[in-house]
Amino acid sequence: MSALTARFFAETGIEVRATFQPVGVLREKLVAGEPCDLLVSTHVMLEELALEGRIVADTVAMLGRVRTGIAVRSRDRAPAIDTREALGASLVAAPAIYLPDPARATAGIHFLKVLRVLALDQELAPRLHTHANGAAAMAALARSDQEGSIGCTQITEIRITSGVKLVGPLKGSLELATAYAVGLSAVARDGAHARRFAEMLAGRESAALRLQSGFEP
């Protein structure tokens, strides 16, 4: 995102002010009337908002799929996560587990489901450290002084955080791949420039950057 906002500023002289929140919070803010020119969220949510008339339907453009992954501090050994049994054992061994809002963040909601599937939700509840979004959760993991701590969030949020490293995506039936898109707000104050930035986000010129950041076609 920072590379694209810098390029956009060089091209237009306009500064992009981005707000990073769980998808549920973004929806609440948009519905409440908070100023917004462009929204990046799940494709499902953008389609819903387009049906409600809050997003211009023909501007919705796919960014790609993002998997939910497991992270550890950069200096820690990567735990085994390739099977249900291995993931469960690694979670049980972790002294602390970091995740985004389990009520409104896509990855947080899914991770709680994973814990229930593994029958670990009650056992691990005291070790869960929840944060407003995935980036905040990963930043907290990076600051942790507990060796072996684990984090779970979208791979894009893991890759942008200094001090943590990606172990890998959740596997098999525990996997979650979420489609993300961008769309123009129906009440955008600067629709022309918002459309241009959307083109930069979703177009060919940023395809390599999206892939590097964790978006899959």
Which residues are covered by each model-predicted region?
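Exported/periplasmic ABC-transporter solute-binding proteins
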Residues: M1-T19, G24, E28-P35, H43-E52, ...
